[in-house]
Amino acid sequence: MELVVKSVSPETLKTATLVVTVGESRVLAGAARTVDILSGGAVSLILKRGDLAGKVGQSLLLHNLPNIKAERVLLVGTGKEDELSDRQLKKIVGAALTCLKGLGGTDAAIALDDLSVKNRDTYGMARLLVEALADGEYVFDRFKTQKAEVRALKKITLLTDKVKAADVERASTHAQAIATGMALTRDLGNLPPNICHPTYLGEEAKALGKAHKNLKVEVHDEKKLADLGMGSFLAVAQGSAQPPRLIVMNYQGGKKGDQPFVLVGKGITFDTGGISIKPASGMDEMKFDMCGAASVFGTLRAVLELKLPINLVCILACAENMPSGTATRPGDIVTTMSGQTVEILNTDAEGRLVLCDALTYAERFKPQAVIDIATLTGACVVALGGHTSGLLGNNDALINQLLDAGKQADDRAWQLPLFDEYQEQLDSPFADIANIGGPKGGTITAACFLSRFTKAYHWAHLDIAGTAWLSGGKEKGATGRPVPLLTQYLLDRAGV
């Protein structure tokens, strides 16, 4: 879908559909008022008849209004308030898209200047709107033999005045890059585990590297992992016929010698739980256990689209967790790359076992900051539900930067404590550390485990177990989060 920014009067634009807004007060303003005046009061007359109450997300389609170049005018309700919430704006965009997709036209124009969102300037509002448009266009039907017949919109024009045009252009550019990254993340997450395994992700990384000269890609196999001393990582993979892969993608967009930012993604392409096997119900959704790695892929894709002037290293720890005669047993003790030993009390707490070695590996890049992203704990879903990612770390400035980025991107996170008292729950009588800390504070103790391997740099941990995918029904699938949060964080660091 092409997005174009124009500064013209709405009534003069030739388009299949012009989208304007009407509130519950039904007092017309902006583009709606202009259309009403030029059409001889056609809009006012319809509102007086009660055909549109103006509630958020309501819509009414008008055809062939006099003196209006658009073939149709779509009225969309914006509710009672002068300023919308982020959620209301997304609902309005969704309602407009639903209507537009059912029409014969392939283009539309949206009057942006009539929309106002709480605590957002022109850039923030326009970016949220464009991201919502892109989200509404996403379809994953690769394995459907009969594709859904949906009329695709080929072009949307964003109408704004000349003073705001530069901000809207910038917002549109950023939003489209983020949407591209989210779509890649969703595609990878939605792929079945018989296709999307560690080797597949390695090939995807190599393909991305070939397409971009400033992206160096290395894919390390199990022999290299053994040479590196990644005993914890290898322990997770040893029960599967699928070999593990450590994928390292090094983007050089900044100056040579600039310290990079490092993103580390959990890439468990299917998680049965291993010997500590999960219940059968819902196990199909464990293909989403690689969404941390998928979100790193997506964020990198957005960074490449935007050509951000930063250095970024992306490390993906990819494995499959399966039960077999060669699988890790509860009670096994392994030696991590750091030299610390781990007693594996539960093989279903495997994400931290691959991440700890990847986090140790990250030290060699002398990073400005390291952020790991993982569908790590069910406890995070219990604590925060499906709307907010869990955030923990060892540096307050980094935590605050990520919280702010999440707020800006409408991809929120919430900080949980990382107090020393929780560390005691990981004590083991036989090894340096146990891989679980009991039933209480599971998200926190998982982060405490990771913190043992991140003392050399500023580090944050995003637990996306509740936000990376939706369960059940037609909406089931990967969400693309937290690509908006991570991209916003990197945009802020790049200063663009």
Swiss-Prot record:
Keywords on record: Aminopeptidase, Cytoplasm, Hydrolase, Manganese, Metal-binding, Protease
For this protein, the Enzyme Commission number is 3.4.11.1, 3.4.11.10
Where do the annotations place Mn(2+) 2 binding? Answer: 266, 271, 289, 350
Q: What class of enzyme is it?
A: hydrolase
Q: Name one GO biological process term.
A: proteolysis
This protein is called Probable cytosol aminopeptidase
Query: Which family does the UniProt entry place this protein in?
Result: Belongs to the peptidase M17 family.
> Where found in the cell?
Cytoplasm
Q: What does this protein do?
A: Presumably involved in the processing and regular turnover of intracellular proteins. Catalyzes the removal of unsubstituted N-terminal amino acids from various peptides.
First-listed, main subcellular location of the protein, grouped into a coarse class:
cytoplasm
Provide the catalytic activity annotation.
Release of an N-terminal amino acid, Xaa-|-Yaa-, in which Xaa is preferably Leu, but may be other amino acids including Pro although not Arg or Lys, and Yaa may be Pro. Amino acid amides and methyl esters are also readily hydrolyzed, but rates on arylamides are exceedingly low; Release of an N-terminal amino acid, preferentially leucine, but not glutamic or aspartic acids
Q: Which InterPro entries does this chain map to?
A: Leucine_aapep/pepB, Macro_dom-like, Peptidase_M17_C, Peptidase_M17_leu_NH2_pept, Peptidase_M17_N
HAMAP family attached here?
Cytosol_peptidase_M17
Q: Name one Pfam family in it.
A: Peptidase_M17
PANTHER family found in the cross-reference section? CYTOSOL AMINOPEPTIDASE (PTHR11963:SF23), LEUCINE AMINOPEPTIDASE-RELATED (PTHR11963)
Q: Which GO terms describe its cellular component?
A: cytoplasm
Give the cofactors, semicolon-separated: Mn(2+)
